[in-house]
UniProtKB/Swiss-Prot annotation:
Superkingdom classification of source: Eukaryota
Disulfide bonds: none
Segments for region (Disordered): 373-439
Entry's induction text: Induced by wounding, feeding with herbivorous insects, infection with the fungal pathogen Botrytis cinerea and infection with the bacterial pathogen Pseudomonas syringae pv tomato DC3000.
This protein's UniProt keywords: Jasmonic acid signaling pathway, Nucleus, Plant defense, Transcription, Transcription regulation
The keyword Metal-binding is assigned to this record: no
GO CC annotation, single: nucleus
Organism placement in taxonomy: Eukaryota, Viridiplantae, Streptophyta, Embryophyta, Tracheophyta
Protein name: Transcription factor MTB2
Primary role: Transcription factor that negatively regulates jasmonate (JA) signaling. Negatively regulates JA-dependent response to wounding, JA-induced expression of defense genes, JA-dependent responses against herbivorous insects, and JA-dependent resistance against Botrytis cinerea infection. Plays a positive role in resistance against the bacterial pathogen Pseudomonas syringae pv tomato DC3000.
Entries under Pfam families matching the protein: bHLH-MYC_N, HLH
Basic and acidic residues biased stretches: 393-415, 425-439
A single BP term in Gene Ontology: defense response
Organism per entry: Solanum lycopersicum
Annotated Low complexity bias: 382-392
Length: 579
């Protein structure tokens, strides 16, 4: 964070982000490049957030964005709420309010677009980004929603600061249903949020972070929804502990001295029988696909390292991204399902189950007993590879070199470079949801362009009028097809009737007379044109020569108007209605 800001840059960034957001970022001592301690694979978290944003419920409602603020450790060693993952989408047609539509007019301003891209570029470089992983150059247009979403990636919230920090400290959810008209700036990102047209913002604390949801609609508060989302995103930590308790149970069986026991023989967890629901969808039995997304990577059951003093301390292998975390420095917070995993000196009778916030003195102290180990995130692969190196404080903490060599291997070979902050903690395509939304809009616009090229007589150039004209044109074409099919059927039914043929023989010649309905005769259209122009046939002759039939008509006008050649030509050309 040694980058110098000119007065012009400060004015530009403050105009885009808001003065409060800019001052917060500049005064924050927490680097956005912090060591994130993931509570499960990124795919699971991203899929859950995508379900909240991209899968409408029965009422065709879904959130416009979802951000999970995860407990993270900064370079200075303090715990903060940092960017865990997120997903966003643009407002659908008819979903945004009138005020939102007015705000979207600014997208056509090229100067505004250049300013937004420049601000994102400045933030990217300010927070340790490089030209190699710069995503700003690939952006075409930055909408208000995308600007709010991308700028939020650079925020982190210590204890009691910002909306997420205050929500997590208080342990209570925040539901704002009228953000656009509210004068309360509950968060430093309020200006960006209002610029994106968000009407409803919800903050829900969990035991591992804060879930933030937003919508351009005004949504009334729902405690059932809050409870469902809270239990759903809090289930990560409970599943991790349940899996970690199994391999550690073997340590208890080996201990004959009760004072050296680390875990009781069985560790109960309160499992609710009621299946959580989000938008009325059952997450347990009704949707196996959603439960699969909640699956966590199984921790490696590696042997416990022996200290020279003879005591065994549990060291959880975190190479697959599973690691217990708690905001232990937040004294006012009581995270649920918390257990002291790193206190071998504590007697076994102090170990009690924690369900939905138990006794505060027995909470998880793993982060207090650990030094901030190095964590590197690989941004080169589609699946993140996290290699944290935990260090347990002890006066005999030097472990045998052979133990280190035993665990060294592929992880050391693929040790990645640490880069600046990128969304979604290192996926190869960090902005896939933003790009997908942009590609969807571009594809939709291309379809409208193609439709506008084939629809005649367009009344207006807007999309609604174009769709209406296309519907009218298709309806007219269908009517014409039905009329043509009816005429073909009528002609086919009359053609099966045999023509009335009369043959008369004279002395030197034979007279053949053929009679058939006018509609089936080849000259029927000519006769119809005569009728429309009020012309009567005086004489008709038929001659055949050189494989050609010559039909000659002698006509005269039966109306008051004079018969001209132009009128007959217009009638034969199908323009008799203009006469």
């Amino acid at each position: 964070m040694t980058m110098l800001w000119s007065d012009e840059d400060k004015t530009m960034v403050a105009a885009v982000l808001g003065t409060k957001a800019f001052d917060y970022l500049m005064s924050s001592l927490v680097s956005a490049e912090c060591s994130l301690m993931a509570m499960g694979s990124d795919e699971n978290l991203q899929n859950m957030l995508s379900d909240l944003v991209e899968r409408p419920n029965a009422s065709n409602f879904s959130w416009n964005y979802a951000i999970f603020w995860q407990i993270s450790r900064s370079k200075l060693g303090e715990l903060v709420l940092g960017w865990g993952d997120g997903c966003c989408r643009e407002a659908r047609e008819g979903e945004e309010s009138e005020l939102t539509r007015i705000l979207n007019i600014r997208l056509a301003d090229e100067a505004q677009q250049r300013m937004r891209k420049r601000v994102l570029q400045k933030l990217h470089m300010f927070f340790g980004g490089t030209d190699e992983d710069n995503y700003v150059s690939g952006l075409d247009k930055v909408t208000d929603t995308e600007m709010f979403f991308l700028a939020s990636m650079y925020f982190s919230f210590p204890r009691g600061q910002g909306g997420p920090g205050k929500c997590f400290t208080a342990g209570k959810h925040v539901w704002l249903s009228d953000v656009m008209r509210s004068s309360v700036d509950y968060c430093s990102r309020s200006f960006l949020m209002k610029s994106a047209g968000m009407q409803t913002v919800v903050l829900i604390p969990t035991d591992i972070g804060v879930m933030e949801l937003g919508s351009v609609r005004t949504i009334p508060e729902s405690l059932e929804l809050v409870h469902s989302i809270k239990s759903c995103f809090s289930s990560f930590l409970a599943q991790v502990r349940a899996k970690q308790a199994a391999p550690l149970a073997a340590v208890v069986a080996e201990k004959k001295n009760g004072n050296n026991s680390v875990f009781p023989s069985s560790f109960p967890f309160d499992q609710s029988k009621e299946n959580p629901k989000i938008f009325g969808q059952n997450l347990e039995s009704g949707s196996t696909e959603f439960r699969e997304k909640l699956a966590l990577r199984k921790p490696v059951d590696g042997p416990l390292e022996m200290y020279r003093n003879g005591n065994r301390a549990p060291i959880i292998n975190t190479q697959n991204g599973v690691r217990p975390v708690s905001w232990a420095s937040f004294g006012n917070v009581k995270p649920g399902n918390s257990v002291d995993l790193y206190s071998p000196q504590a007697p076994p009778n102090n170990l009690r189950e924690f369900v939905n916030g138990g006794r505060e003195e027995l909470r998880l102290n793993s982060l207090q007993h650990q030094k901030p180990g190095g964590m590197q995130i690989d941004f080169t692969n589609s699946r993140p590879v996290v290699s944290p190196v935990p260090t347990v404080e002890s006066e005999h903490s030097d472990v045998e070199v052979s133990c280190k060599e035993k665990h060294a291997g592929p992880a050391d070979e693929r040790r990645p470079r640490k880069r600046g902050r990128k969304p979604a903690n290192g996926r190869e395509e960090p902005l896939n949801h933003v790009e997908a939304e942009r590609q969807r809009r571009e594809k939709l616009n291309q379809r409208f362009y193609a439709l506008r090229a084939v629809v005649p007589n367009i009344s207006k150039m807007d999309k609604a009028s174009l769709l209406g004209d296309a519907i009218a044109h298709i309806t007219d074409m269908q009517k014409r097809i039905r009329d043509a099919e009816y005429k073909l059927e009528k002609r086919g039914s009359t053609s099966v009737d045999a023509a009335d043929i009369n043959i008369e023989a004279a002395s030197d010649e034979v007279i053949v007379r053929a009679r058939c309905p006018l509609g089936t005769h080849p000259v029927a259209k000519v006769v119809e044109a005569f009728k429309e122009t009020q012309v009567s046939v005086v004489e008709s002759k038929l001659a055949v020569g050189n494989d050609t039939v010559y039909h000659t008509f002698v006509v005269k006008s039966s109306g008051p108007e004079q018969l001209t050649k132009e009128k007959l030509m217009a009638a034969f050309a199908g323009e008799s209605n203009s006469l």
